[in-house]
């Protein structure tokens, strides 16, 4: 009887869920039933064990390769042509390459800025008079006669505003989409070229202009007089004088200020210049997938971040730190540099910053920006047939028309825009899909297989740690029957532990996904700081 009882208990023990052979023979994990088959160790079981371990090793290698690839945060670039019913016309800023009109410079102006403009030397005498035209030299001698002269207070902002080229005199003709436009449609703005003007700036309170068609005649067309007879005589190398004649133009978004001295293109007199544009919407990824800046701009001058706003803000701070003043075109309410500060500090400091200092002004690319691709073509104006007509129309000589008149025609090539977007090449879903596919290929496992392993570990934990407690509470069986009687209390405990195990598994999956999603971003952000 005792032997029969022992055999019965061994049989029951071998059928426990925590028994490894029971688990292996019931698991969906491929190869486990052959490795832990009942009976003695055989060569066949050894081969199955070797194959399983080899497959498991390959699985770990491939999974680690996928994980490493994910943490490289790769991205791809998507290019798309998007048709639109209408497009917002860009802001168009232009500046005369000559900053100051010679006829508007007074004796007091010349006294204060003569040396800055290389018109006078340090002794307030005309520099290089042999280089001047007779008419210019005569006018300059009258203004440079300082005997008994008492200088008045001088203001650089007023000087730039008063002597800069006036759009009411420069603008000869203007049309947008075939309708006439006027100087009032242009906003005055200051750049390093002095007094400039922006069409469709959005700063005058008027709604932004749109275009409904592509091609010439559906954009902005202006005829300008660059007024070369007002150009300052050039007798030396300064930042305030120019060797060229014409205008500098920048086509930009209304969300960014013009940076025309660095990003503008030139338009020469005597030509009609056609500028065919295409709007480009650029979308970049933030760290760790890309290098763009998604944070708002930390500036007291600009609310919207852009590369040009960042550079202007940086240049302003650089001059305030090194010269204790700002240039006229720079934002803010700080003290404007005097002519002496311009010559001795501001101009040299800004030139050094732009040309040589590559570490001070480091501006990240914004995550969302609009750019305009351009194609330029030119034709000669005036033609021989129109020269006399234009001379009569504007009451000028034919030579003046050739030397001073230009036409600028800006339009969209077509009513569509390019969308260039960076996208994540490998996301969490792809990582989990690859790992799941490799698990199925090498060991035939799935998420439910992992659940089986958790369930088995729960059974082992219950038998090893709680077995003694459960056996003490198990009711005694009579020797006359083989029925196993389980109390309701034991069933409740088992159910609670099983539910807790499943909840732990669910939490594990959730935490794994959260770690995959948020940990890379946190690591990337900390490394960026």
Curated annotation (Swiss-Prot):
Classification via Gene3D superfamilies: acid-sensing ion channel 1 domain, Acid-sensing ion channel domain, YojJ-like
Keywords: Cell membrane, Cell projection, Disulfide bond, Glycoprotein, Ion channel, Ion transport, Membrane, Postsynaptic cell membrane, Sodium, Sodium channel, Sodium transport, Synapse, Transmembrane, Transmembrane helix, Transport
GO cellular component: dendrite; plasma membrane; postsynaptic membrane
Cystines in this chain: 95-196, 174-181, 292-367, 310-363, 314-361, 323-345, 325-337
Ranges in the topological domain labelled Extracellular: 69-427
Expression (tissue specificity): Expressed in central nervous system.
Site feature (Involved in proton-dependent gating) residues: 357
Transmembrane region(s): 52-68, 428-458
Function summary: Forms voltage-independent, pH-gated trimeric sodium channels that act as postsynaptic excitatory receptors in the nervous system, playing a crucial role in regulating synaptic plasticity, learning, and memory. Upon extracellular pH drop this channel elicits transient, fast activating, and completely desensitizing inward currents. Displays high selectivity for sodium ions but can also permit the permeation of other cations.
Subunit architecture: Homotrimer. Heterotrimer; with other ASIC proteins producing channel with different properties. Interacts with asic1a.
Matching NCBIfam families: ENaC
Domain notes: The second transmembrane domain (TM2) is a discontinuous alpha-helix disrupted by the GAS motif, which forms the selectivity filter by adopting an extended, belt-like conformation aligned approximately parallel to the membrane plane. This peptide belt encircles the waist of the channel and divides TM2 into two discontinuous helical segments. The distal helical segment of TM2 interacts with the cytoplasmic portion of the first transmembrane domain (TM1) from a neighboring subunit, contributing to the structural and functional integrity of the channel.
Protein's UniProt name: Acid-sensing ion channel 1C
């Amino acid at each position: 009887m005792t032997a029969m009882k022992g055999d019965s208990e061994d049989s029951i023990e071998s059928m426990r869920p925590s028994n490894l052979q029971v688990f292996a023979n019931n698991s969906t994990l491929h190869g486990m039933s052959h490795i832990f088959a009942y009976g003695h160790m055989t060569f066949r079981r050894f081969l199955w064990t070797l194959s399983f371990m080899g497959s498991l090793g390959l699985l770990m290698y491939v999974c680690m390769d996928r994980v490493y690839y994910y943490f490289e945060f790769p991205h791809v670039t998507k290019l798309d042509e998007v048709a639109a019913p209408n497009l917002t016309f860009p802001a168009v800023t232009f500046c005369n390459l000559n900053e100051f009109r010679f006829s508007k410079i007074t004796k007091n102006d010349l006294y204060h800025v003569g040396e800055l403009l290389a018109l006078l030397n340090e002794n307030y005498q005309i520099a290089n008079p042999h280089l001047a035209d007779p008419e210019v030299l005569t006018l300059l001698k009258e203004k440079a006669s300082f005997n008994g002269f008492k200088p008045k207070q001088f203001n650089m902002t007023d000087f730039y505003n008063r002597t800069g080229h006036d759009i009411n005199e420069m603008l000869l003709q203007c049309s947008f989409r075939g309708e006439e436009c006027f100087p009032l449609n242009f906003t005055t703005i200051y750049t390093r070229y002095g007094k400039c003007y922006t069409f469709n700036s959005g700063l005058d309170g008027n709604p932004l202009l749109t275009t409904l068609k592509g091609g010439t005649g559906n954009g902005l067309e202006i005829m300008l007089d660059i007024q070369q007879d007002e150009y300052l005589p050039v007798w030396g190398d300064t930042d305030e004088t120019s060797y060229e004649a014409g205008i500098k133009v920048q086509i930009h978004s209304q969300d960014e200020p013009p940076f025309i001295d660095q990003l503008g293109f030139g338009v020469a007199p005597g030509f009609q210049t056609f500028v065919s544009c295409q709007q480009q919407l650029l979308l970049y990824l933030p760290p760790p997938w890309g290098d763009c800046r998604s944070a708002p701009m930390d500036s007291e001058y600009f609310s919207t971040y852009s590369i040009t706003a960042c550079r202007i803000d940086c240049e302003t701070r650089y001059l305030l730190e090194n010269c204790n003043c700002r240039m006229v075109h720079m934002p803010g309410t700080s003290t404007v540099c005097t002519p002496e500060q311009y010559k001795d500090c501001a101009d040299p400091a800004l030139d050094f910053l732009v040309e040589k200092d590559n570490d001070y002004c480091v501006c990240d690319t914004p995550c969302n920006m609009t750019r305009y691709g351009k194609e330029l073509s030119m034709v000669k104006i005036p033609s021989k047939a129109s020269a006399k007509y234009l001379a009569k129309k504007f009451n000028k000589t034919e030579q003046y028309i050739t030397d001073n008149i230009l036409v600028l025609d800006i339009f969209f090539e077509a009513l569509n825009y390019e969308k260039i977007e960076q996208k994540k090449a490998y996301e969490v879903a792809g990582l989990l899909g690859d790992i799941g596919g490799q698990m199925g290929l090498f060991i035939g496992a799935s998420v439910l297989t992992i659940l089986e392993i958790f369930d088995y570990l729960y059974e082992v934990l219950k038998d090893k740690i709680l077995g003694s407690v459960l056996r003490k509470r198990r009711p005694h069986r009579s020797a006359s029957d083989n029925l196993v009687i389980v109390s309701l209390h034991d069933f409740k405990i088992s159910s609670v532990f099983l539910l807790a195990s499943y909840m732990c598994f669910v939490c594990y999956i959730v935490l794994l996904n959260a770690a995959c999603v948020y940990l890379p971003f946190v690591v990337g952000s900390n490394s960026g700081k």
